[in-house]
Curated annotation (Swiss-Prot):
Alphabetized NCBIfam families for the sequence: PRK13254.1-1 (NF009727), PRK13254.1-3 (NF009729)
UniProt keyword terms in alphabetical order: Cell inner membrane, Cell membrane, Cytochrome c-type biogenesis, Heme, Iron, Membrane, Metal-binding, Signal-anchor, Transmembrane, Transmembrane helix
Provenance organism: Psychrobacter arcticus (strain DSM 17307 / VKM B-2377 / 273-4)
GO molecular function, one term: metal ion binding
Name of the protein this chain belongs to: Cytochrome c-type biogenesis protein CcmE
NADP recorded as keyword: no
GO BP annotations, alphabetical order: cytochrome complex assembly
Periplasmic side: 30-166
High-level lineage: Bacteria, Pseudomonadati, Pseudomonadota, Gammaproteobacteria, Moraxellales
Bias (Basic and acidic residues): 156-166
Subcellular location: Cell inner membrane
Main localization of the protein described in the UniProt heading: membrane
Length: 166
């Protein structure tokens, strides 16, 4: 093999190696930023991983919103997909459109049976429902009617709120 051909071969091999490394880094970065969505039933059945960032969505159960008396930023509420209910704790300012009987998607981590949210997103008008929540409700054959607060029995005292650290 002559020198010119060897140089071309080396250049092609280094280029391919660089491309493979670049693709591997992109795949790794995308994997780290992916938040998997779980509805309340999947979370209640234990399908959601513990201490891994996920997205949870559903409707806020009427009568479930509780604020800590000594910490106005500490909020507990429950989300439902009309089959199961999951308690959520959140430390921070809720969006202005957050309300009972409305759709939310929260990003956070499961800690035991409680979803500790680091971010809560609320619907942006009365007709909007997050796509994941709408799909979950459709799969559960629900029309969008919100269950009554009698179906949710909040704990008598607030759970200890843990701040999500990312």
């Amino acid at each position: 093999m002559n020198a010119v051909r060897r140089k071309k071969l080396m250049w092609v091999m280094f280029t391919l190696a660089g491309a493979v490394i670049a693709v591997a880094l992109v795949i790794y970065a995308i994997g780290k930023q992916t938040d998997y969505y779980f509805d309340a039933t999947a979370i209640a059945q234990g399908e959601a991983p513990q201490d891994k960032r996920i997205r949870a969505g559903g409707m806020v159960v009427a009568g479930s919103v509780q604020r800590a008396p000594n910490d106005p930023l500490s909020v507990e509420f429950a989300i439902t997909d009309f089959q199961s209910t999951v308690p959520v704790t959140y430390q921070g300012i809720l969006p202005d459109l957050f309300a009972e009987n409305s759709g939310v998607v929260a990003t956070g981590k499961m800690q035991g049976d409680i979803f500790v949210a680091g971010e809560v997103l609320a619907k942006h008008d009365e007709n909007y429902m997050p796509p994941e929540v709408a799909k979950s409700m459709k799969e559960n054959n629900r029309s969008g009617a919100v269950p009554s607060s009698e179906q949710y029995n909040p704990a008598e005292k607030l759970h200890e709120t843990k701040t999500l650290q990312q």
